[in-house]
Amino acid sequence: MKNIIFFGDSLTAGHGLPAANSFPSLLQQRLDQESLPYKTYNYGVSGETSAGGRQRLAAVLTRHPIDVFVLALGANDGIRGIPVRETTQNLQFIVDAVRRQYPQGQLVLAGLEFPFDLGPLGGHRLAHYATEFKALFRTLADKNSLPFVPFLLQGVLGRRELNLADGVHPNAAGQRILAENVWQVLGPLLQQAVSS
C-alpha cells in the first residue's frame, strides 16, 4: 500500500463537514473502487497559510513514507493579501523539502485563484494582485515540472448551492467537485504508476 499526503488548508480539511465528506476521503473511495493500492492522509489545517505549512511540514514528513504529496496551500495567503513573492518562496521550500526527503515521490500542485469577485470596488491594485496570485501556481508547477491541477475550486467558487453559508468553504456537493478536479490529474498519474 502506498501513501498519498494531502497537505493544505480548510479546503483540504473539509471545513464544517464530517471528515468523510472532504475531498481526500472521497478520493480514497475512488481509489478503493478502482482497486488502486493507495491510502490517503488528510493533513489539511483550517486557516493555514503557506508560512504555517512550511513550519508544520517537518512533522508531517516523518509520519509516513510518502509516495505522492498533493500540495494545496495558498488560499489564506490570498485572503490576507500576503505578497506573492512570500507565498511562492514558502511553496518552493515545501516542494524542495519533500523532494529532498522523498526523491522518488511524486508531487502534485493544486492551483488557486484570488477567492473574491473583485467587483467595481476592487480597484487596480487588487486586480493586479489577483493576476499575480493566480499566475504563481502555474509558474511554480512549470519551474518544478509538477503535475498541476489548474484551479482547485473550478466549478465551485461563487456558486451558492455548492458552498456553506459563509460562501467561502465548499459544502459536501462542492467537495465532490473538488475531488473530481484533483482526480483529473491524480487519477491518470496513479494508474500509470501501478501499470508501469
Regions found by a protein language model. Give the residues of each.
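Serine-esterase "nucleophile elbow" of acetyl-processing enzymes
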Residues: 1-65
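Alpha-helical cap/lid subdomain in secreted, periplasmic
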Residues: 29, 55-196
